[in-house]
């Protein structure tokens, strides 16, 4: 059980470190890769949290009735990877194409589904993995680890962006 707890904590830090910094850069990526205005990119990306808010209660109810938490975690992580790969590889290749906005919108919808699946299954798994009297400490450790990731990953992203875009000061000129 202890080993599974640490796997859940690792999934938490990796997942949220891939989601929250991505929210910061996604609009700029849409602007750079598809020549969207900031307003259009923001409108399209707003589908992500709205979709997640709409379906998370349904997925929580499904988890309560049917279980399948591990499967939900796997599917959610897989959908996030698909979204990130689409933004990194497909969107730059589709610049100027009618398919670019379609792929972007579809990827963002998938990310919203992912952001519903993972939290709906991850947080309820913690009480199943640790003794009730240690539950507060378990959540504290997970949040502590998560915040280390949220501290480190934006700096890593910034260093990578600076390395692949030497001398470019305008983020709208970034090559993602």
Describe each model-derived feature in a short phrase.
Residues 2-52, 119, 123, 153-154:
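Extracytoplasmic gate region of multi-pass secondary transporters
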Residues 13, 46-50, 78, 140-148:
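Transmembrane alpha-helical cores of Major Facilitator Superfamily
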Residues 27, 59, 153-161:
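Small-residue (Gly/Pro/Ala) motifs that create kinks and tight helix-helix packing interfaces
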Residues 27, 31, 63, 126-131, ...:
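Helix-terminus/helix-capping segments at the ends of transmembrane helices and short amphipathic helices
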Residues 38-39, 132-142:
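Loop-to-transmembrane helix entry/capping segments in MFS-fold secondary transporters
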Residues 55-68, 161:
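Helix-to-loop junctions at the C-terminal end of transmembrane segments
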Residues 69-122:
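C-terminal transmembrane helical hairpin of 12-TM major facilitator-type secondary transporters
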Residues 159-176:
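A membrane-interface helix-boundary motif in multi-pass transporters
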């Amino acid at each position: 059980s202890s080993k599974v707890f640490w796997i859940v904590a690792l999934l938490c830090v990796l997942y949220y470190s891939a989601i929250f910094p991505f929210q910061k850069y996604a609009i700029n990526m849409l602007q750079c890769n598809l020549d969207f205005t900031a307003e259009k990119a923001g409108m399209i990306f707003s589908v992500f949290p709205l979709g997640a808010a709409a379906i998370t209660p349904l997925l929580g109810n499904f988890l309560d009735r049917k279980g399948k938490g591990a499967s939900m975690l796997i599917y959610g992580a897989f959908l996030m990877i698909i979204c990130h790969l689409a933004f990194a590889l497909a969107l730059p290749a589709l610049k100027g194409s009618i398919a670019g906005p379609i792929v972007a919108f579809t990827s963002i919808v998938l990310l919203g589904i992912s952001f519903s699946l993972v939290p709906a299954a991850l947080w309820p798994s913690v009480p199943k993995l640790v003794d009730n009297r240690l539950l507060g400490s378990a959540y504290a450790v997970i949040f502590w680890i998560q915040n280390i990731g949220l501290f480190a990953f934006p700096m890593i992203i910034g260093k990578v962006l600076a390395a692949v875009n030497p001398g470019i000061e305008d983020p709208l000129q970034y090559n993602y």
